[in-house]
Swiss-Prot record:
Stored HAMAP family: Cys_tRNA_synth (MF_00041)
Motif ('KMSKS' region): 296-300
Summary of subunit composition and partner proteins: Monomer.
Entry EC number(s): 6.1.1.16
Cofactor descriptive note: Binds 1 zinc ion per subunit.
Recorded GO MF terms: ATP binding; cysteine-tRNA ligase activity; zinc ion binding
Name of the protein described by the UniProt record: Cysteine--tRNA ligase
Organism for this UniProt entry: Novosphingobium aromaticivorans (strain ATCC 700278 / DSM 12444 / CCUG 56034 / CIP 105152 / NBRC 16084 / F199)
Cellular component GO terms held in the UniProt record: cytosol
Chief localization: cytoplasm
Reaction equation(s) it catalyzes: tRNA(Cys) + L-cysteine + ATP = L-cysteinyl-tRNA(Cys) + AMP + diphosphate
UniProt cross-references to SUPFAM superfamilies, sorted A to Z: Anticodon-binding domain of a subclass of class I aminoacyl-tRNA synthetases (SSF47323), Nucleotidylyl transferase (SSF52374)
């Protein structure tokens, strides 16, 4: 009698995603059969990313992992903006890169390199997969000039300050945000000579007598590309128009993405009409803000939470990833240290369960057995329902809690789900969660020495000394865990 291996699980639930452009859930129909092409607005590398910024990239990573889980060949592009992003997000203020370079007395190129590396370190810490391509804005300036030349005659006009896009030349401008195009609406400050309040610069001229650190020759004079032009060009160059999905934070829904769409309409058709077909991407997706009790997180106040601060306090970055997954991406997520602590506790429970499972199943089965098919189907249904991670996590924890099942099959099911959630539980060690808080005087060797002394005291039945040592250890910010193989953990504030 031959023994047949279980058939591979094939996710079959229809994938439905919320399209900000149409304001409804839509079935995902790839532009190219069997493929998914995704562009995500990346950081402007003038400062460290805060954890609210990083929520956008956890969301984009989750989307990409889900598309891969659904059997699609994923091409994911994330840009790095190293020029052209003004402090006002529209057409007022100065370039954020130039402002930081002046503040830190460094070149813009040094600023870009430093903060790009800092961003990539956070990407790695949060177990965000590398995209197929990082596109760096300054590497695409010739293509940006060519794009602007193609649309300039019918859709742009020139002022002393730059080349501006006339939003009245495309159909239904601002559909994404229902933005107003009239002057005085308060959405965008006026620039002298603009035809419409919402018109925006696609090329900013260097003022006479000035020299910027980043500037290029163009048909409209020496200058630099506008922020909105950059994303239109990089997404179209790498993915081609139309592509499947464009992601970004909800703040992009107001100005940046409507302007991208307007440019794409102008580029993709002769009359600027037909928003759904010519918006560049078929589906536009936006994650909501991370908020504190004082309001949404931003860098403008000069006070914001970096991922490194969480680590300095002893929290593993994947606890923050789990915190993000506990809320739907379109919902506001309130950050609190209590909430982060609860996510860390939940992550520890998961890791303990996976660790115990790995002891029973040294190898992962090639495929989960049929016992796990209903769970995988529920997990698939949750993720296919506009990335319902809260339900998916519940199903995942149900699987972790199953008893009297084949451990190798169970580990295969856990691995399949975690490949989507991205918590890295099969590779993570419990000791990795034990991060020493910054400023704590004692190190791990010192703790182990005290624990050895306490162990000796208990062996000698010197319970008074044992209790005194436990108190001494606790006073140093350490929790002793008798009976747990890990032995101890840091107490986190």
């Amino acid at each position: 009698m031959s023994v047949h291996a279980p058939a591979p699980f094939a996710p079959s639930a229809p994938l439905r995603l919320f399209n900000s452009l149409t304001r409804q859930l839509e079935a995902f129909q790839p532009v190219h059969a069997g493929e998914a092409r995704v562009y995500s607005c990346g950081p402007t590398v003038y400062n460290y990313p805060h954890i609210g910024n990083m929520r956008a990239y956890v969301f984009a990573d989750l989307l990409g992992r889900t598309l891969s889980f659904k059997g699609l060949k994923l091409t994911h592009v994330i840009n790095i903006t190293d020029v052209g992003h003004l402090t006002d997000d529209a057409d007022e203020g100065e370039d954020k890169m130039e402002k930081m370079a002046r503040a830190e007395a460094r070149s813009i190129w040094d600023i870009a390199k430093h903060y790009t590396q800092a961003y990539w370190e956070d990407v790695k810490a949060l177990n965000i997969r590398q995209p197929a391509r990082w596109t760096i804005a300054t590497e695409y300036v010739p293509q940006m000039i060519a794009f602007a030349e193609r649309i300039a005659a019918k859709h742009c006009y020139e002022l002393d300050s730059g080349l501006y896009f006339d939003v009245s030349t495309v159909a239904d401008y601002g559909r994404l945000a229902r933005a107003q195009t009239e002057e005085g609406e308060g959405r965008i400050e006026a620039v002298e000579g603009k035809r419409n309040g919402a018109d925006f610069a696609i090329w900013r001229k260097t003022p006479p007598g000035e020299k910027r650190q980043m500037e290029w020759d163009s048909p409209w004079g020496r200058g630099a590309p506008g922020w909105h032009l950059e994303c239109s060009v990089m997404s179209g160059e790498v993915l081609g128009f139309p592509f499947d999905i464009h992601t970004g934070g909800i703040d992009h829904r107001e100005i940046h993405h409507p302007n991208e769409i307007a440019q794409n309409q102008a580029f993709c058709c002769t009359n600027g009409l037909d928003v759904p077909a010519n918006s560049g991407a078929r589906i536009w997706m936006h994650n909501n803000f991370l908020v504190e009790r004082s309001g949404k997180m931003s860098k403008s106040s000069g006070e914001f939470l970096r991922l490194q601060l969480l680590i300095d306090k002893g929290y593993h970055p994947l606890a923050y990833r789990l915190m993000c997954l506990q809320a739907h991406y379109r919902s506001e997520l309130e950050f609190s240290w209590e909430g982060l602590g609860a996510a860390l506790t939940r992550l520890k429970r998961m890791l303990i369960a996976v660790g115990q499972l790995k002891e029973r199943a040294p190898e992962v089965a090639a495929q989960p057995g049929p016992r796990f098919t209903p769970f995988l189907e529920r997990f698939d249904a949750a993720m296919s329902d506009d990335l319902n991670t809260a339900v998916a996590l519940t199903v995942f924890e149900e699987v972790l809690g199953l008893k009297k099942v084949d451990p190798a099959d169970k580990l295969a099911a856990v691995a399949a789900m975690d490949a989507v959630l991205g918590l890295g539980l099969l590779e993570l060690d419990r000791r990795a969660l034990r991060i020493r808080p910054k400023g704590v005087e004692i190190d791990e060797a010192g703790i182990e020495a005290l624990l050895d002394a306490r162990k000796a005291a208990r062996a000698e039945k010197d319970f008074a000394r044992s209790d005194a040592l436990r108190d001494q250890i606790a006073a140093k910010g350490v929790e002793v865990m008798d009976g747990d193989p890990l032995g101890w953990e840091w107490k986190l504030a």
